[in-house]
């Protein structure tokens, strides 16, 4: 798929997995979409599975953004305590788009926790609380 086609899908609000080898244009396409969202004042969470990847996109780790840290599971009490944290509550409830770069470095358990957190904060049974989710990465580039 060409970058223009991917960008059209992103602008249409579709959930998208961008993949390709190094230099394929994943980051370029993400940055174009991020600029598009920011110009329209759409709240976007720019995250990555690693700190280095997050800083390259002026974002933060998905673990920090979602408030999951290094946890493997979250109880109802954990979620209630998380909702009491003003900063976490505001950005999780306001987010309309979630971008996760270097998805291949994120364990499925952590992705499930992000889903659990967003469903709780958005008070929705939809996947990821119903927000648009864009993941990018190359599963052939595993450690």
PLM regions: where:
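Conserved ATP-binding/catalytic motifs of P-loop helicase motor domains
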Residues: 1-143
